[in-house]
Amino acid sequence: MVTQVPSSTNILVIGGGPAGAYAAGVLVREGFEVTLLEKDFFPRYHIGESMLPSWRQFLRFIDMEEKMKNYGFLPKPGGAIKLNQDKREGYTDFIANNPENSAWNVVRSEFDQLLLNHVAEQGVKVYEGTRVDEIHFSPEEPTRPVSLTWSKDDKTRGDISFNWLVDASGRNGLMSTKYLKNRTFNRSLKNVAVWGYWTGTNRYAPGTNRENAPWFEALTDETGWVWFIPLHDGTTNVGVVLVEEDSKRKKAEYRAKHEGKSLAEVQYDRYMEDIQLAPGLIGLLGDGKFDGKLQAAGDYSYHASGYAGPHFRIAGDAGAFIDPFFSSGIHLAFTGGLSAACTIAASIRGHCTEEEASEFHSSKIKTAFTRFLFVVLGIYKQLRAQQSQILYEADEESLDRAILSLRPVIQGAADADADLTKEELENTLDFCKSVLEDEPQANGNGAAKQDAVPAPIPVALSSGAGPEKDAKRREIEAESLRSLQEMDDCKRNFGTEVINGFFVKMEQGVLGLVRA
């Protein structure tokens, strides 16, 4: 890595995580000068270890797929999902039609460093341990960033000017939170996660083509869910996600019964009690040993009203975050990184106006966010009312039908082959809509907990009449259908999907936008 931050650059990227590194890598391969500032020194710890098969498509575009295949990360053949103890778990099979369609479970510190090193080798100037303190805007064009002030732990400071900015600063979201102030939290998905690492655990479906698949299971008290993700270093990440209100209530009740315990002791005891509410997980833990260290984070879902403006783009968690369910984070980071790179290249090369390019990027991020939001809301609606008929009918034994219906979303670019039809995409959207619109129906084993369901229907899909509401409904439906199409194949859909009258020219050396 280089050490002296220059005083100017053509394209500046804030953040060396997946969104920033990917955008930088795509842009430098187009022949542009790219500088990247990262506040941490890699490797650094990060949560988010389960991948989608769509990653292969993105990594292939920057010639990194073979590095991933040869590194030694644990192959991920699919994922198991259990939302009702009376029914068999559902399974999303990544490799049913193609053994090469598997994803990976990764140690993020290693994967993120592998990606950052790869783009540095491609020509990106990377500066680690470099914080961004302030972004400066043009006096003539107040919404256009033109330079920033950086600093390091050794007290050195400086300024760097640029023509283009990609904000991939993670959840801090500098542009969105500090300057645009356009971030909105989704009250339906205010959750908290607590996780730790275990050794000596069992594996899901050992000896079959499902071995090493992660396990996701709803808690029997309907307050949240757990994850079980095996890793190549011999550890397994076991996490608990609770609705924030339920987490607070459980902690308060526990403290009332166990006065004098420290916060760390309460957190540990609550974690151990919550995982007991996932019988399938207990079987997978077997005789495994917990390493004794817990970590926690607020999994608050949020989005922004826009993700671009004059000469800047926002990508990854800097703009939006949904939920850890379905491992959408890095897929959305890569989508945002590629869109940022495509639209910057298009603007530089005169394929369109800068306003048209920035609007394309914002629309791309919004549709990607909408896709996963619909599915995650449906999952939470079911796990909060487990005896209700939401994702499955009363006589169904598992989630398999629902998973098949949602295949274009939850597998990323995997099983959704290049022949995916408009009818199949519409069926997926219709399924999502029906889940969000229908009232939960008790199936005889219990009453629906409608008051506990935290997933309201998106306003544009709720029932009601009137020309304005009907028009908004059609707009969201069309946007969502486009977002489902983009799950097919990142190169194929980026090169064919029309957004705001443009589609992407997915060809290295001439990357940009083409008017439809």
Curated annotation (Swiss-Prot):
It comes from Armillaria mellea. One of its GO terms (molecular function) is monooxygenase activity. SUPFAM superfamilies: FAD/NAD(P)-binding domain. Melleolide sesquiterpene aryl esters are cytotoxic secondary products with anti-cancer potential. Armillaridin shows therapeutic and radiosensitizing effects on human esophageal cancer cells. Armillaridin induces autophagy-associated cell death in human chronic myelogenous leukemia as well as of hepatocellular carcinoma cells. Armillaridin can also inhibit the differentiation and activation of human macrophages and thus might have potential to be developed as a biological response modifier for inflammatory diseases. Residues 440-475 are annotated as: Disordered. Keywords: FAD, Flavoprotein, Monooxygenase, Oxidoreductase. Disulfide bonds: none annotated. It catalyses: melleolide F + FADH2 + chloride + O2 = 6'-chloromelleolide F + FAD + 2 H2O + H(+). Chloride binds at residues 328-329. Pfam families: Trp_halogenase. InterPro entries: FAD/NAD-bd_sf, Flavin-dep_Halogenase_NPB, Flavin_halogenase. It comes from the Eukaryota. Its EC number is 1.14.19.-. Flavin-dependent halogenase involved in the biosynthesis of melleolides, a range of antifungal and phytotoxic polyketide derivatives composed of an orsellinic acid (OA) moiety esterified to various sesquiterpene alcohols. The halogenase catalyzes the transfer of a single chlorine atom to the melleolide backbone, resulting in a 6'-chloromelleolide product. The enzyme acts on free substrate and does not depend on carrier-protein-dependent acceptor molecules. GO terms for biological process: secondary metabolite biosynthetic process. Armillaria species are both devastating forest pathogens and some of the largest and oldest terrestrial organisms on Earth. They forage for hosts and achieve immense colony sizes via rhizomorphs, root-like multicellular structures of clonal dispersal. This is Flavin-dependent halogenase armH2. FAD binds at residues 16, 19, 49, 330. The keyword Flavoprotein applies. Transmembrane segments: none annotated. Belongs to the flavin-dependent halogenase family.
